[in-house]
Regions:
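C-terminal alpha-helical cap/extension of soluble enzyme domains
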Residues: 226-292
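Alpha/beta enzyme core
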Residues: 15-17, 35-56, 60, 69-80, ...
Length: 292
């Protein structure tokens, strides 16, 4: 694992996740596509007393920033703030994209081929694990099993069925064959935020998954639309890493919109972006309190 800070008492991501598992708390993961949001996330994490933070770029976000640029930016912010920050390639969907992130210096990769038949999903995850291990055995690899519906946006309603959930016996087989470090599973969670229905996790189902396959670090994706209590209950049941994205985007968007409404003639970017980043920072601080 690449160390971004010269004097920080460094630990591997796997060690932070293991400590979270043993301590029954979770490490936060927050996506970014701009420097100000990255700084807001890291600043909030450091001020909250969280042991570390994960930041992620989706394929779209990394396409906007640039994969090597994202690595350089995270490295600079982590060093400047003297705080452990781990950069994750979030839901990369092909081996080639995962390889590009690994070669550029990402600390972690999610190979998301959950849309494929299980055998193909296993083969893809195994290929990424084997390549990552050959480059640096400390790079953390996450697989995904189950149908995680939605996108990182606000929608009215998304139909959720137990048939979409990750099946405990399949998760156990996936972990056994691939050797992934982390697992993203589906038990009522969705990507994005819905306005006309209540999102609710099926905690008993998740507990069955943990019993069937206790080894990996379990990851909750799509936490933006969930209640704080649902997130807390998932952590009690074994979640050690929680992803937020849509809520950050909404907070950023809404504050920029507010700034333009209040000051329609303002054209200096930092004068309307800085308040938006501050709103993101407040939101991240709240989420990190929930994860403790």
């Amino acid at each position: 694992m690449r160390c971004y800070f010269s004097i920080w008492p460094y630990m591997k991501l796997s060690e932070y996740l293991q400590q979270a598992k043993e301590g029954h708390y979770a490490i936060g993961h927050f996506n970014f596509s701009t420097e100000d949001v990255l700084k807001a996330v890291v600043g909030a994490a450091k001020e909250s007393g969280a042991p570390c933070v994960m930041v992620g770029t989706s394929e779209g976000e990394s396409g906007y920033i640039g994969i090597p640029e994202a690595v350089a930016l995270v490295r600079a912010v982590a060093k400047d703030m003297d705080y452990p920050v781990f950069l994750n390639a979030d839901h990369f969907k092909t081996f080639d994209k995962c390889k590009e992130a690994i070669d550029a210096g990402y600390d972690s990769v999610i190979i998301d081929t959950s849309r494929l038949p299980m055998a193909d999903n296993i083969a893809a995850a195994k290929q990424v694990v084997e390549y990552a291990r050959s480059v640096n055995p400390d790079i953390s690899i996450e697989g995904e099993l189950g149908y995680l519906k939605g996108a990182s946006e606000v929608e009215k309603k998304i139909e959720i069925s137990p048939a979409d959930y990750s099946k405990p016996e399949e998760v156990a087989e996936f972990v056994r064959q691939t050797g992934v470090d982390r697992m993203a599973v589906v038990f009522g969670n969705i990507h994005g935020i819905v306005t006309d229905q209540e999102e609710k996790l099926d905690i008993p189902h998740f507990e069955k998954i943990v019993v069937a396959a206790p080894a990996p670090a379990y990851v909750l994706h799509g936490a933006s639309g969930l209640s704080d209590d649902d997130v807390r209950n998932s952590i009690k049941a074994g979640i050690v890493n929680v992803h937020f994205n849509t809520e950050l985007r909404v907070a950023y968007h809404d504050e920029i919109k507010k700034q333009f409404e209040e000051k329609p003639g303002e054209t200096t970017p930092y004068k309307y972006l800085a308040p938006a980043a501050e709103e993101v920072k407040k939101l991240v601080a709240h989420k990190l309190e929930v994860l403790k």
